[in-house]
A protein has these predicted regions:
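Catalytic histidine neighborhood in serine/cysteine hydrolases
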Residues: 253, 262-277
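Flexible "cap/lid" subdomain of the alpha/beta-hydrolase fold that forms the substrate-access gate
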Residues: 1, 10-13, 21, 28, ...
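Conserved alpha/beta-hydrolase "nucleophile elbow" surrounding the catalytic nucleophile
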Residues: 33-35, 101-102
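A short, Lys/Arg-enriched amphipathic alpha-helix followed by its capping loop at the start of a domain
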Residues: 45-54
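The serine-hydrolase catalytic nucleophile loop
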Residues: 35-45
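Catalytic histidine-centered segment of alpha/beta-hydrolase-like enzymes
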Residues: 275-284, 288
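Alpha/beta-hydrolase active-site loop signature
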Residues: 36, 61-65, 130, 276-279
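Short beta-strand element of the alpha/beta-hydrolase
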Residues: 25-33
Length: 299
């Protein structure tokens, strides 16, 4: 594992890399982390993909050190999509490239999967499915209503993170609580240490919280990202692998049961037993095998 830094047109991003990222004979794999997490979340999948012949780039997404806090202050999903697309270009990706995202990274990846600007062959989303697949539909409203109350209770933190100053002041306690609730039985000590390095002060913590706050301020989306604004709420157009932990404490696992027939042909949905929200860390053997199998089948 090494670290590479690139200056994109809107922000500087540092990434963990595996494999020879300058060897364009290898297909590119871009891995996007979520909240409250860092690029180190890919410490199992990254080496597995490199061993399978990929060159792997896992950025610390905007606002997470050592990446920069963006000057435009945007943490809107289209801005995150823009960064991932820019990484594909910066690292000379081609139509063999693949994209993997977890949590906010999954929201970003799902948006790219729905975009006409998508250069990736296929996409893996973990822990958050494409948002349109979660909407109610005819004949499914009853099941949707049965999931909704529990999901609303699980998602309390999304409203808490909208508050001014309080989330920053209680940030360390909040994220430790979320890790333990979202992935019961998993020891997050190493991941929380990485997170403390990535978000060392209130400015960086506000950046991480900005991902949530930006969604209630969509009219403030900077102009360079507006061409992607509708995509993250659209249905994916390329085959997608969706993975969710059976014990996920952030997103009710029952969502996985109702989305398969709303994904493009060639897509796969799998619930990982013995894993919660951070399934790539809890069951890396199973997750790595699922991802590699899907990438092989979609070639």
């Amino acid at each position: 594992m090494n670290q590479r830094t690139v200056v994109l047109d809107r922000v500087m991003l540092a990434s963990l890399v595996w494999g020879d990222v300058d060897d364009t004979d290898r297909p590119l794999a871009v891995l996007l982390h979520g909240f409250p997490d860092t690029a180190h979340t890919w410490r199992h999948l990254g080496p597995a993909l490199a061993e399978a012949g990929y060159r792997v780039v896992a950025p610390f997404t905007r606002g997470y050190a050592p990446s920069a806090i963006p000057e435009d202050g945007s943490y809107h999903v289209p801005a995150l999509m823009h960064d991932a697309l820019a990484l594909h270009q910066e690292y000379d990706g081609d139509d063999r490239a693949v994209l993997v995202g977890h949590d906010w990274g999954a929201i970003t990846a799902n948006g790219i999967a729905a975009s006409a600007a998508n250069p990736f062959r296929t996409v893996v989303a973990m822990a958050v499915p494409p948002l349109p697949t979660m909407y109610p539909r005819r004949g499914d409203v009853g099941r949707w209503l049965r999931i909704l109350p529990r999901q609303a209770a699980l998602s309390w933190y999304t409203l808490f993170n909208q508050l001014p100053r309080l989330p920053e002041r209680s940030f360390d306690r909040l994220v430790a609580h979320l890790w333990r609730r979202w992935s019961p039985g998993y020891d997050p000590a190493e991941d929380l240490a990485h997170l403390a390095e990535a978000l060392p002060d209130d400015e960086h913590k506000a950046a991480a919280l900005g991902y949530y706050r930006a969604q209630s301020r969509r009219r403030q989306l900077p102009h360079p990202y507006r061409s992607l604004a509708a995509d993250w709420l659209a249905e994916p157009e390329v085959p997608l692998l969706y993975l969710q932990g059976a014990d996920d404490g952030a997103l009710d696992p029952r969502w996985a049961d109702r989305i398969g027939d709303r994904l493009p042909a060639g897509s796969v949905v799998a619930v990982i037993e013995g894993a919660g929200h951070f399934l790539q860390l809890e069951r890396p053997d199973v997750v790595n095998a699922r991802v590699l199998e899907f990438f092989g089948a979609s070639r």
